[in-house]
């Protein structure tokens, strides 16, 4: 199976690199110290501190592996000046939900950076997919868990 390409903004790439560095240095050292201290408590078969530290170590190693793979296959989104008024990955788009008569603003990002509560939706989400390649004034319909919603693009900003 081919490895998936991860679309990232430059900001997202930098954040993931910073997290990886932190996990590989600071967190690994902290957890190794916890394991060392827990071993000092004696019998490992009934040592809750040791078990907890080993579980934490496994979680950190899993996250490190994920981040290394993500960064290996990352593609940084480049602003295309020829498409400055078209919604692309990396664009910040303000649209109106015509069903609710409510304006919303989100940045369209790759799945690895998606965080709707922080104003970032995935290009693979139903709304993200529906907005891609639209221009200011365009409308589209998107199927959501709550039913079909009509959206109208109000503004598009790059970067």
UniProtKB/Swiss-Prot annotation:
Keyword tags: Coiled coil, DNA-binding, Transcription, Transcription regulation
GO molecular function: DNA binding; RNA polymerase binding
Family annotation (PROSITE patterns): GREAB_1
Entry annotated with the keyword Signal: no
GO BP terms: DNA-templated transcription elongation; regulation of DNA-templated transcription elongation
Pfam families reported in the protein's UniProt record: GreA_GreB, GreA_GreB_N
Nucleotide-binding among keywords: no
Regions annotated as coiled coil: 10-75
InterPro entries in the cross-refs: GreA/GreB_C_sf, TF_GreA/GreB_CS, Tscrpt_elong_fac_GreA, Tscrpt_elong_fac_GreA/B, Tscrpt_elong_fac_GreA/B_C, Tscrpt_elong_fac_GreA/B_fam, Tscrpt_elong_fac_GreA/B_N, Tscrpt_elong_fac_GreA/B_N_sf
Family in the record: Belongs to the GreA/GreB family.
Annotated function: Necessary for efficient RNA polymerase transcription elongation past template-encoded arresting sites. The arresting sites in DNA have the property of trapping a certain fraction of elongating RNA polymerases that pass through, resulting in locked ternary complexes. Cleavage of the nascent transcript by cleavage factors such as GreA or GreB allows the resumption of elongation from the new 3'terminus. GreA releases sequences of 2 to 3 nucleotides.
HAMAP family with a match to the protein in the record: GreA_GreB
The protein's name in its UniProt record: Transcription elongation factor GreA
Species the sequence originates in: Finegoldia magna (strain ATCC 29328 / DSM 20472 / WAL 2508)
Chain's gene name: greA
């Amino acid at each position: 199976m081919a490895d998936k390409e991860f679309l990232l903004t430059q900001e997202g790439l930098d954040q993931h690199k910073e997290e990886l560095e932190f996990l590989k240095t600071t967190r690994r050292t902290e957890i190794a110290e916890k394991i060392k201290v827990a071993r000092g408590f004696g019998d490992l078969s009934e040592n809750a501190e040791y078990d907890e530290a080993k579980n934490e170590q496994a979680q950190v190693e899993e996250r490190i592996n994920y981040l290394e793979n993500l960064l290996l296959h990352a593609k940084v989104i480049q602003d295309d000046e020829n498409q400055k008024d078209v919604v692309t990955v990396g664009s910040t788009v303000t649209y109106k939900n015509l069903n609710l008569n409510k304006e919303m603003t989100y940045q369209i990002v790759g799945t690895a950076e998606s965080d709707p509560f922080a104003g970032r939706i995935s290009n693979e989400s139903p709304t993200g997919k529906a907005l891609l390649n639209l221009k200011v004034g365009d409308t589209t319909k998107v199927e959501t868990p709550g039913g079909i919603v009509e959206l109208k693009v109000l503004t598009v900003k790059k970067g």
